[in-house]
UniProtKB/Swiss-Prot annotation:
<keyword id="KW-0547">Nucleotide-binding</keyword>
<dbReference type="Pfam" id="PF02637">
    <property type="entry name" value="GatB_Yqey"/>
</dbReference>
<comment type="similarity">
    <text>Belongs to the GatB/GatE family. GatB subfamily.</text>
</comment>
<protein>
    <recommendedName>
        <fullName>Aspartyl/glutamyl-tRNA(Asn/Gln) amidotransferase subunit B</fullName>
        <ecNumber>6.3.5.-</ecNumber>
    </recommendedName>
</protein>
<keyword id="KW-0436">Ligase</keyword>
<dbReference type="GO" id="GO:0050566">
    <property type="term" value="F:asparaginyl-tRNA synthase (glutamine-hydrolyzing) activity"/>
</dbReference>
<dbReference type="InterPro" id="IPR023168">
    <property type="entry name" value="GatB_Yqey_C_2"/>
</dbReference>
<dbReference type="InterPro" id="IPR006075">
    <property type="entry name" value="Asn/Gln-tRNA_Trfase_suB/E_cat"/>
</dbReference>
<keyword id="KW-0648">Protein biosynthesis</keyword>
<dbReference type="GO" id="GO:0005524">
    <property type="term" value="F:ATP binding"/>
</dbReference>
<dbReference type="GO" id="GO:0006412">
    <property type="term" value="P:translation"/>
</dbReference>
<dbReference type="InterPro" id="IPR003789">
    <property type="entry name" value="Asn/Gln_tRNA_amidoTrase-B-like"/>
</dbReference>
<dbReference type="InterPro" id="IPR004413">
    <property type="entry name" value="GatB"/>
</dbReference>
<dbReference type="InterPro" id="IPR017959">
    <property type="entry name" value="Asn/Gln-tRNA_amidoTrfase_suB/E"/>
</dbReference>
<keyword id="KW-0067">ATP-binding</keyword>
<dbReference type="InterPro" id="IPR042114">
    <property type="entry name" value="GatB_C_1"/>
</dbReference>
<dbReference type="GO" id="GO:0050567">
    <property type="term" value="F:glutaminyl-tRNA synthase (glutamine-hydrolyzing) activity"/>
</dbReference>
Length: 484
């Protein structure tokens, strides 16, 4: 029986590090990239006698997340100890939430192939992150433990098994990431591990009512790896079932080099962690007034912003979706539109540059919009140079790249690189005459009905003028000379 006769069933557990300055239960910095164990204290090292104190900002960020996702905010929630042994967990337990999480229910809506899908949520709870095992840190190949990350605040967002393909899982995670970034509670940096997810994957024969045995794939930190891991795991489980072998409930790791999952350990159930209430922390009381204040402070969320871009600015659904996927990019876009001029035509021009050339440059440099030397005002200046006929498309790309990398003013780049467009009819006419004289055969074919050759002539004229001819003037002169 082929894999198409089976239905994959997926639920995601997304771990999002919160953008607080200090850790969840102590005053240590949450900054990424410090020297190993530089951001630690007796609390996050788990030393005897050290007591946790809850960071209020963590609670507020968890509530904001719950409100944005349509969750019920519990007026009373409780921390619990999740007991297990691992070298990067210094206390021998993780402070998390179990029976009484801060948020319950909710949903995430995402778009795939032009259709909206909704995945329901089970809960959102607060917890502390573990440290990080670092391997091959010494000449003898020994491993070390870096506890800088231990105690960094997380929210874990748990979905119901409502996702039915790897593509749905990826789009769900993209939509959730965009919401968290818009809220300002997470930076969306999957590469640094501030947003990562576990996938619970099972398969069942189509038409069956009972879910199959699930396996959990741990700690995927890219959309590509998530898709590859789910697709491999689904195939693996189908092959086991077809061979008459059982699917063992277990925790698995994804190996990106080999593109496959491998067994890590048997899958734990709740009783394996021996949860019990955290005795060193009181219950978390969330007052109704706080909830309403935070509700009133919610920003425009990505789906609403995308709909506004389509309705007010005339952008396509795809372009609007690309812009709102990153809150910093959409804010930069808004500023550029404001600097260049209102209206759908202006917005579409700005969107084309942001989604195209700026996305390419940002991908090359790894820079976030806040670090771009090409400010919204400078992009607006480039667009005005195009509108005035001072530069053309190829020249504009050179200007944008130079400004992006150096921060120079656009008009200065145009002068320094000699990119000003030639609009003088006399100069262009001389180039047109030269091209037509050099290509009599193509001229005859054009006049015989091969009108698509106009592109060839334009290209030859632009080559003759080293790309500086004004395309509109070139086109007009060519058509006049060719008898159109």
């Amino acid at each position: 029986m082929p894999i198409s006769d089976f239905q994959v069933v997926i639920g995601l557990e997304v771990h999002a590090q919160l953008l607080t300055a200090s850790k969840i239960f102590c005053g240590c910095s949450t900054a990424f990239g410090g020297a190993p164990n530089a951001h630690t204290c007796p609390v996050c090292l788990g030393l005897p006698g050290a007591l946790p104190a809850l960071n209020r900002s963590v609670v507020e960020m968890a509530v904001r997340t719950g409100l944005a996702l349509g969750c019920e905010i519990r007026p009373k929630s409780v921390f619990a100890r999740k007991n297990y042994f691992y070298p990067d967990l210094p206390k021998g337990y993780q402070i998390s939430q179990y029976e009484l999480p801060i948020c319950e229910g909710g949903e995430v809506t995402f778009t795939l192939d032009g259709r909206d899908h909704t995945a329901r949520l089970v809960r959102i709870h607060m917890e502390e992150d573990a440290g990080k095992n670092v391997h091959d840190v010494a000449a003898d190949g020994s491993s070390g433990v870096d506890l800088n990350r231990a105690g960094v605040p997380l929210v874990e967002i748990v979905s119901r098994p409502d996702l039915r393909s790897a593509e749905e899982a990826v789009e769900y995670l993209k939509a959730l990431r965009a919401i968290l970034m818009a809220l300002g509670v997470n930076d969306g940096n999957m590469q640094e591990g501030s947003l990562r997810c576990d996938a619970n994957v099972s398969v069942m024969r189509k038409g069956a009512s009972e879910l199959g045995t699930r396996c959990e794939i741990k700690n995927m930190n890219s959309f590509r790896f998530l898709k590859q891991a789910i697709e491999f795991e689904a195939r693996r489980q189908v092959e086991l079932i077809e061979a008459g072998e059982p699917v063992v409930q277990e925790t698995r790791l994804f190996d990106p080099d080999r593109g496959e999952t491998r067994s890590m350990r048997s899958k734990e159930e709740a009783h394996d962690y021996r949860y019990f209430p955290e005795p060193d922390l009181p219950p978390v009381i969330v007052e109704a007034a706080l909830v309403e204040r935070l509700r009133g402070e919610l920003p425009e969320l990505p789906r609403a912003k995308a709909e506004r871009y389509q309705r007010s600015l005339g952008l396509s659904a795809q372009d609007a979706g690309n812009l709102v996927a990153d809150a910093a990019v959409s804010a930069w876009f808004d500023a550029a539109v404001a600097a260049y001029g209102a209206g759908p035509e202006a917005a579409k021009k700005v969107a084309n540059w942001v989604i195209g050339e700026l996305a390419r440059l940002a991908n090359e440099t790894g820079e976030a919009p806040a670090a771009w030397k090409l400010t919204p005002a400078r992009l607006a200046a480039v667009l005005r140079l195009i509108d005035a006929g001072t530069i053309g498309g190829p020249g504009a790309k050179q200007v944008v790249e130079e400004v992006f990398r150096t921060g120079a003013e656009p008009d200065a780049v145009v002068k320094a690189k000699g990119l000003a467009q030639v609009s003088d009819e006399g100069a262009i006419e001389a180039a047109v005459d030269k091209v037509l004289a050099a290509n009599p055969g193509e001229v005859e074919k054009y006049r015989g009905g091969r009108k698509n050759l106009v592109g060839f002539f334009v290209g030859q004229v632009m080559k003759e003028m080293r790309g500086k001819g004004n395309p509109a003037v070139v086109n007009a002169l060519l058509r006049r000379k060719l008898g159109d």
